[in-house]
């Protein structure tokens, strides 16, 4: 068997030289560092089922205003680190005494990560196209490591979500997804996104989600085939309970290689 579900501390191999991402070596043996899918092709590696969001430069994320100071809006980013949006990074000229008129505590906003220092000071900006305050719709949260699966290879999955639900969709890198449309359409879209999160390690998921949103019965060959990920992550570094965007994209390509890519 080239792959299987494993838990932290599980013995994977006695060949320490084959240790790959998501593993550690102890007494000459390889053990799993994570709860996820182990791949035994080539180097022994483990891809986690879940992960935490760590802010990264250029990420678009959905944040909440938690405080307003004389020169900054302080944002909760869905990570261990709050972000700072300086008044100069707002798209309009704003006097510091009027900052709360534009954004106040509790407001939800799409921002871009401008910079992250070595000390994890997170600077945000709303000067990028697409940044805006969100006054309508709903926010859905998924595990951040599942974001590439929600987007899909080449944007295939998110394109289907938008087209078949008749809703606007914005996927933040921090696992927060904004949707906007009619209530019944948002209800169905929410269920579809939950399906993607819970079945992200299955193949044929893009077809399955599309059929669900169209109200079609399952039955297309391969649409609900249950297959563990044949992950190829040699050379990709993973930390405990964390997965890189590059790794997630590789997983997505492997999972959707039998499905049509819709742009």
UniProtKB/Swiss-Prot annotation:
Keywords recorded for this protein, A-Z: Cytoplasm, Exosome, RNA-binding
Keyword RNA-binding recorded: yes
Primary location class: cytoplasm
Gene that this polypeptide is encoded by: rrp4
Domain KH: 135-196
SMART domains linked: KH, S1
CC terms in the record's Gene Ontology section: cytoplasm; exosome (RNase complex)
Bias (Acidic residues): 218-245
HAMAP family, sorted: Exosome_Rrp4
GO molecular function: poly(A) binding
Lineage of producing organism: Archaea, Methanobacteriati, Methanobacteriota, Stenosarchaea group, Methanomicrobia
Record domain S1 motif: where: 51-127
Subcellular location: Cytoplasm
Subunit structure: Component of the archaeal exosome complex. Forms a trimer of Rrp4 and/or Csl4 subunits. The trimer associates with a hexameric ring-like arrangement composed of 3 Rrp41-Rrp42 heterodimers.
Pfam name, any one: ECR1_N
PANTHER family for this protein: EXOSOME COMPLEX COMPONENT RRP4, PNAS-3 RELATED
Protein's UniProt name: Exosome complex component Rrp4
GO biological process: CUT catabolic process; exonucleolytic trimming to generate mature 3'-end of 5.8S rRNA from tricistronic rRNA transcript (SSU-rRNA, 5.8S rRNA, LSU-rRNA); poly(A)-dependent snoRNA 3'-end processing; RNA catabolic process; U4 snRNA 3'-end processing
Family named by the database record: Belongs to the RRP4 family.
Role summary: Non-catalytic component of the exosome, which is a complex involved in RNA degradation. Increases the RNA binding and the efficiency of RNA degradation. Confers strong poly(A) specificity to the exosome.
NCBIfam families for the chain: PRK04163.1-1
Region (Disordered): 213-263
